[in-house]
Amino acid sequence: MKRAKRPLELSFRLAWYILNKKLRGQKRFPLVTMLEPLEMCNLACIGCGRIREYKPVLDKMMTVEVALNAVKESGAPIVSIAGGEPTIHPRIDEIINSLIKQKYFVYCCTNGLLLERLLKKIKPSKYLCWVVHVDGMEEKHDESVDRKGVFTKAI
């Protein structure tokens, strides 16, 4: 199996970013912005306490403006979008498209259930990588997420 490679531009941009920070005397700086625009999820995976632990804030979502400002404030060239399930966010396409337009490298972590509808709103880009989480092959994954058919839909 061939390993997926990161885009060459990402390697150069990251090296330039680090070099620039070091030359300016900065000892600590972010490489990745971890953006969680919401806590809500469309699964209740065994072993994940998110729904239970975050119950008081499950209905809260970052606005597009707050999300983009957080990324800008961080200054990191890479943005990892997770959550909950980020594809539930009603304006996640706007967030992702804006980040791509600004040439951030975006990794969107998803369970894959809502990915098909988003692929119609977000064009392929060298700045975007979809990270679909699976917990093993079909039987194991569906058992882990406590719902049949999730593996097949995600893959």
Where are these regions (language model features)?
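Glycine-rich S-adenosyl-L-methionine
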Residues: V145-I155
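Short, hinge-like loop/turn segments at secondary-structure boundaries
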Residues: P124-C129, K148-G149
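Conserved alpha-helical substructure of the radical SAM core
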Residues: K2-K121, S125-K126
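Conserved radical SAM core fold
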Residues: P86-I88, G112-R117, V132-R147
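Membrane-embedded glycan transfer/ligation machinery
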Residues: M34, V131, F151
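Glycine-rich loops and low-complexity Gly/Arg-rich segments
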Residues: L58-K60, F105-Y107, V131-D135, A154-I155
